[in-house]
Amino acid sequence: MTAAVAQQASPSSRTAVSKLALRARAGLPIATAALTLLAIGIWLVTGASELLEYRRGAIASGEFWRAITGHLTHWNADHLLWDAVMFAVLGALVERTSRRAFLATCAVSAAAISATLWFCRPGLELYRGLSGIDSALFVFQAGWLVREALRERRCVAALLPTVALAGFAAKIGYELATGATLFVDSAAAGFAPLPLAHVIGAAVGLLTLGAFVRKLGASANQDHMHQQRRRFQELLFTKCDAN
């Protein structure tokens, strides 16, 4: 199917698709695996979560790393299970499309969520969890699938990720309205859900997807210009040889 589409596409589109195919075959999603194992390791090591969690007072005292590492800490095994499984699956999908896009989405969403909590939730002392970053990865991957399906005029294929995005928006709406989570029993775990982190994560996923698509388009245009220049040079040399 991919080969058939590539043959019908323009040279620049074929080049862009070929680059993505090469990246997809580059190997296992190592960064995703490493971060997932790191989150599990932090949970298993006694005292690590307390040292790395988002703790407002400690950050104010200069422990700035907590703003990033806090996303790798969790409240209980159930919380870790849901977050880590979603991160592993979504991260692997995004990383196989582009490792740079995966790392950028994780880094920007982690920083943006912590900054938002710092400025908009000054009364929040503690925060843990990968769910905000999971939200960013989900929106990136679902949006990418929609974009690719529409680019190839496969409207039916675009339906499922579109429905998934709508369901995700409904989930966030439910969390905002009820203050409860759908998948993790936050009350039993002794922590309060924070839908704001999911909203910020989703926004970051959309922004990083847009940046990735623009960069991909710019790269395709540049490759097309190089091809045109080579063709012109070949034509010029052919005329010179004929003379």
Q: PLM features: what roles do these ranges have?
A:
Residues 1-23, 170-243:
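C-terminal transmembrane module of polytopic alpha-helical membrane proteins
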Residues 19-33:
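N-terminal membrane topogenic signal
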Residues 29-46, 87-141, 161-173:
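Small-polar-interrupted transmembrane alpha-helices in polytopic inner-membrane proteins
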Residues 45, 92-97, 141-151, 207-216:
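Structural signal for the C-terminal ends of transmembrane alpha-helices
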Residues 49-76, 175-185:
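Extracytosolic (periplasmic/ER-lumenal) interhelical loops and adjacent juxtamembrane/interface segments
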Residues 56-60, 76-91, 109-113:
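Hydrophobic, membrane-facing alpha-helical anchors
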Residues 80-87, 128-139, 189-209:
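Alpha-helical transmembrane segments that form the membrane-embedded catalytic/substrate-binding core
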Residues 150-165:
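Membrane-helix boundary/juxtamembrane motif in polytopic membrane proteins
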